Amino acid sequence: YEPHTVSSDRNDHLSPEFLSLNPNNKIPALIDPQGPGGKPLPLFESNAIPIYLADKSGQFLPTEPARRYQTIQWLMFQTGGTGPMFGQLGFFHKFAGKDWEDKRPRDRYAQESRRLLGVLDRHLEGKAWMMGDDYTIADIAIFPGINTLTTYYNAGDLVGYEDFGNVRRVFEAFSARPAFQRALNIPDRNG
C-alpha cells in the first residue's frame, strides 16, 4: 500500500480528488487499483475498509460463518460504540470542550466510555484477542482507539483505565505488534 497524507489544515479532504474517493470528506479512504474484476475500487469508512482487505487477503476475518459474524459484530461495536464515544470524549476533554464551564457533556462521554471499556474487559477475560486465539479485524479496529483514548486524548485517568486489566493486557500485546509500531509512524515522522 501507499499512504497519502490528507491535511484538514490544507482542506485536502474537500478536494475533488478526495471527494471522488469519499463523498463524506473524512479519512480514511482507500483506492484499490486492482479491485474486483481488476478495476479500481474506492472505499471509505473505517470498518468497511478492513472487511474488504480481510476478504481480499484471506486474513484476519474468519471464514466459518458464526465466527465471521461474531467478528463483524465486534467491528460494529467499535463503529457505534467505542469509536464515537472515545472521539466525543476527546473533543470535550482535550479540545474545544475543555474550556466549557459545563462539564456534563464531558462527564457523559467519560461515563459511557467507561461502560464500553467494561464490556470489552468482561469479553476479554481469558482471551488473547477479541476472538479468542485469533487476531482479527476486530482487534485492528478496537485497539487503536484505546491508544487514542489514553495517549492522544490523555483521558485514561478520566475513564479509570487502570481498572480494566483485560483491556490493558490485550492492548499491551496489540501495541507490541510490529504492524502497529509501523502504523504509529505513518506518515513518516522520522524523516
Please place each PLM-identified region on the residue numbering.
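Positions that flank functional sites
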Residues: S8-D9, Y135, R189-N190
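Structured helix-beta-strand junction loops
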Residues: N24, K56, G126-K127, R177
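Residue-level recognition of oxygen-bearing side chains
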Residues: A48, N166, A179
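GST-like fold's C-terminal all-alpha helical module
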Residues: W74, Q78-A176
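Exported/periplasmic ABC-transporter solute-binding proteins
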Residues: R182-P187
